[in-house]
Amino acid sequence: MATNANRDTCVVMTLCNRPDYTRQTLNALARCDDVDKFPVALLCEPISPEVIDVATEFTTLPHVKAFVMVGQRRVGCNVNTYSALAYGFDHHDRVIAMEDDTVPGRDFLRFADWGLTKYRADQDVFSVCGYQRTPKDETGFRNAVVRESWFTPWGWATWRDRWESVRDSWPADDRQVSWDTVIDKLTRRGRCEVRPMLARIQNIGAEGGAHVPGAAWHREHHLNPHWVETCPGPRVDEWHEVHASTTKALRAYHPC
């Protein structure tokens, strides 16, 4: 099943106060295959002029269709993420969601578009996610995907009906619980995510994140030395699903 990146899909990204991460992520997004076919909405907290400048510069690239929305006041990660998704689904049927520290590989958008098409009618699937902590001996599974009863918020995509099933239980206060924990533990209701065995997203958020105690912890638990950008190989246009037992990298075994 070939992808068709011109269906009713957009990219949304939440930005806050980490300009270096924002720059790395947007530079990578600008290099993605098919980025010209997806509108990109950048939702900025109103606290870092440098982040807003980096986002605005991205919108000037001739091959992207992007715009910046700056909040009137700081609302926190939970509300900003809700606003990004709500905006996306107010205008589109399918949304690809990113954060300032989720660096996409070159074929991430094509992968997400493929997954959104492949699993649209499969109500056992809640989301498609580009992140995976790929073991070195699994890098050869370049076009394989697995499903797991989990939710990962780093470079993910979903559909309007799935969004409508979780939006009413969205947490507003960052001090209580993170939005992704609510989805994973409560509102996805057993539905799974689909992930590539060879990661298409790199998490670079070692500093300044809400739930990362430091660079050493991030390096041990989130950073993936083996992903599509460090493992050269042929272009993938079609992925296929394999049994979850094929990988040692199920999130249930490595939940951080």
Where are these regions (language model features)?
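Peripheral/terminal regions associated with large enzymatic or DNA-binding modules
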Residues: 1-98, 102-256
